[in-house]
């Protein structure tokens, strides 16, 4: 055996065969990765709140989790980890409803839909998820032209250049809702009330007050339909069955081996 453990296993479709083999163990946990349909809030027509709301209702999260991640992942309705005690479940606010999506597009002045770009980085959740989302958007009249990019291209065109309509990426930094307070960030969301809330949060030490602020922050970005909130990325690992002490969850992007040992 050349490999004894593989943290962050990239092929969820292969996990059942490992789980069925007594030589291996499969660990399924959670990450800090909010997987989102990132939306360029300054690029028409996504500068229109009604269009972003239509986009949200055009998306069937569970179909994406099932099709792209083979069932691994937790639906989210805002940019916050469901395992965090301050998480607010807002998934119902953007529930899948293709007829409502069509109605909202018509209200926004796009009864025939529109065309946009969907630029996808390499991870399978993005490539597979992108195909599923493109089909879901097509069903309500939105034609999303897919471009598959390598990471350097994605960083240049999308993250730095902001030359995109839509993209899919998992934001794996812990507790990073404060990125929505940066108007220059790649989804270009500019809300002074949210920015003030994040400043107040930074200056607040009382736990109850901070919790209330974080819940308000989640609600603001959900109400503004800044991005399409898809799912919390699952932590998937495969290891030799005799290994103990591996982390099931991934609270950071590190693979912690300090407690790892072999069973006798």
Residue ranges and their predicted role:
Residues 1-43, 152, 170:
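Extracellular/periplasmic solute-recognition and catalytic clefts
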Residues 40-42, 88-89, 112-121:
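Short, hydrophobic beta-strand segments
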Residues 40, 46, 74-107, 125-128:
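Structural transition elements
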Residues 35, 56-88, 125-134, 152-264:
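Detector for C-terminal structural segments
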Residues 6, 117-119, 167:
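Short, well-ordered beta-strand segments
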Residues 1-4, 16-21, 49-50, 131-140, ...:
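Short helices/loops that flank or line small-molecule/ion binding pockets
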Residues 9-13, 122-124, 146-156:
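Short helix-initiation/N-cap motifs at beta->coil->alpha
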Residues 2, 23, 111-118, 135-149:
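A local structural motif
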């Amino acid at each position: 055996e050349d490999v004894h453990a593989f943290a962050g296993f990239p092929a969820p479709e292969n996990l059942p065969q490992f789980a069925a083999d007594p030589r291996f163990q499969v660990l399924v946990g959670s990450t800090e990765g909010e997987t989102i349909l990132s939306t360029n809030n300054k690029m028409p027509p996504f500068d229109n709140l009604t269009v972003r709301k239509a986009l949200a209702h055009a998306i069937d999260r569970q179909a994406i989790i099932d099709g792209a991640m083979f069932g691994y992942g937790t639906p989210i309705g805002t940019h916050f980890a469901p395992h965090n005690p301050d998480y607010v479940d807002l998934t119902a606010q953007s529930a899948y409803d293709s007829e409502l999506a069509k109605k909202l597009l018509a209200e926004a002045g796009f009864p025939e839909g529109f065309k946009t770009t969907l630029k996808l980085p390499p991870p399978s959740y993005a490539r597979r998820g992108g195909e599923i989302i493109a089909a879901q958007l097509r069903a309500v009249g939105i034609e999303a032209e897919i471009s598959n990019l390598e990471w350097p291209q994605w960083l240049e065109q999308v993250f730095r250049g902001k030359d995109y309509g839509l993209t899919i990426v998992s934001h794996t930094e812990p507790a990073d809702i404060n990125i929505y307070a940066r108007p220059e960030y790649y989804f270009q969301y500019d809300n002074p009330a949210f920015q003030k809330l994040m400043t107040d949060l930074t200056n607040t030490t009382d736990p109850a007050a901070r919790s209330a602020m974080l819940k308000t922050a989640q609600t603001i970005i959900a109400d503004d339909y800044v991005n399409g909130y898809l799912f919390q990325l699952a932590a998937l690992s495969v290891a030799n069955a005799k290994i103990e002490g591996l982390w099931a969850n991934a609270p950071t992007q590190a693979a912690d081996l300090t407690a790892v040992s072999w069973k006798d």
